[in-house]
Amino acid sequence: MRQLETEVIAVQEVDYKLPRSDMRNQVLDIATAIGAKDWAFAPSIVGTPGEKWRKLTSADLRIVTSVSDVLDGSYGIAIASTIPVIKWHRLELGNSVVGMPLVVPTESETSSKPKIRAIYVHDEPRLALGATLANGWTVINTHLSFVPGVNLFQLKKLKRWALKIAIETNTKPLILGDLNLPKNLPIAASDWKSLIKQNTYPSWGAKIQFDYLLTHGAFADQVKDLGTIATGISDHLPLRAEIN
């Protein structure tokens, strides 16, 4: 993580105190690695995906931070920031009622490249986590559904929400994350702009862009693409940008 040299990081598919990841608070580990005091984890489910899990109830925390670090083992998305966070936000995006067969990587005993296998995957609840920063930006992390059509509906809802928060907080919105949509679809027929064009999946030979930095307004000339780095900890490549 340190090699990313970032002030703000948005991550998806994060474990929070799950047995498969040695009961670690992975968000705190990430925040510590980049020197971030402010971090938040937004669970999408309680339990382990693909194994035993349940949807959140009214008794479960929707946003876990350093001052509310109490929750059962969960899985979701997170933001860590070295820039002070003024306010955290959460939006429920729902999930597809049907799953899909997906091609997923598994470790290979004979090659450095993962083996590929197809499995049927049920869609989990999706959400967005926002952080209004002290520098005039609101960054919003998400991981949209892999089901075609459902992800477009979720993104439309997310964009409306992002603009609403931007107006309320007098900040500029930035949507980050795995949108599960190929090139240009996230910005088609909209005023949103994709700040970086970079294939991100799979990490061992990226052929398609699923991950994006989206902004609303004329900020493209203030962005420097810092290039991607193969971290070895994900099947996606991270996008890195410097925004003035």
Show where each model-derived region lies.
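Active-site regions of metal-assisted phosphoester/phosphodiester hydrolases
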Residues: 1-8, 17, 21-22, 32-33, ...
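Surface-exposed patches in mature extracellular/periplasmic domains of secreted proteins
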Residues: 38-44
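Phosphate-group recognition and catalysis centered on beta-loop-alpha active-site segments
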Residues: 14
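Short acidic, glycine/proline-enriched helix-loop-strand junctions
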Residues: 25-28, 34-37
